[in-house]
Amino acid sequence: MSVARERLALIVSEFTDLDSREKLELLLDFSNNLAVLPPEHALLASRSEHRVHECQTPVYLQIELDANQKVHLFADIAPEAPTVKGFVAILAGAFDGCSCDEVLGMQSNLLEQMGLADVLGILRSRGLRAIQEYIKREIVRAIEKQTLTKERAMRENA
């Protein structure tokens, strides 16, 4: 089992036997786990290309790949959206330092696995699923950018 899957399985197990109210409380607890943006990402929310437009809550995400193709997720989410912030904190914690393939291979039914789809309602669930898909799209975009940069460097050095 991949690292991301193991991390998510552990989180899903925390939600398993909870009632609706307890699930929401746990999700709110996770919102406290979202890392504070490092200074180099402080202006994330001012850049519209990082906004997840499908989400009603202003959510700004930046995906970076390190030299080993490991994923790092940076997020800026309004404090008045703790459920969204909690979900992003779960994804960030599960995906940080994982390979691109691990994250891209993740199923999009995490809300159902956690039993949150019915608790959160259709609109919020749709927005949270959009966040998952945004992360995958941005990883593909980052891979393409790294590939182009490497190809350009090889041509310049040839």
Describe each region flagged by the PLM.
Residues 3, 101, 106, 111-158:
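C-terminal binding/interaction regions
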Residues 17-21, 78-83, 123:
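Structural motif
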Residues 23, 57, 83-87, 99, ...:
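Amphipathic alpha-helical interface surfaces
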Residues 54-58, 68-72, 85-87:
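Short connector loops at helix/strand junctions that flank enzyme active sites
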